[in-house]
Amino acid sequence: MTLPIELEQEDDGRWFGVVDELPGVMAYGATQEQAAAATRALVLRVLAERIEHGEELPESLVDFMAVRA
């Protein structure tokens, strides 16, 4: 399972990370590493909320999850 994080640097020097498979997931950091860590933390939070509310998950994750009936 992989959810790629795209990292880019803003003109002001800050970094931000985006995960295309999870619309709205974007986090900033002072460094590339901080932006990646903040984005990973946000991904986990978003996935947990989706599971909690019975919402759909990205196709790439569904294959790797066991679903309790």
Task: Locate predicted features.
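Short, charged, surface-exposed hinge/linker loops at domain edges
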Residues: 1-4, 33, 37-69
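Short aromatic-glycine-(Arg/Gly/Cys) micro-motifs in beta-strand/loop hairpins
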Residues: 8-22
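A short, exposed loop/beta-hairpin motif centered on an aromatic-Gly-Thr core
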Residues: 23-33
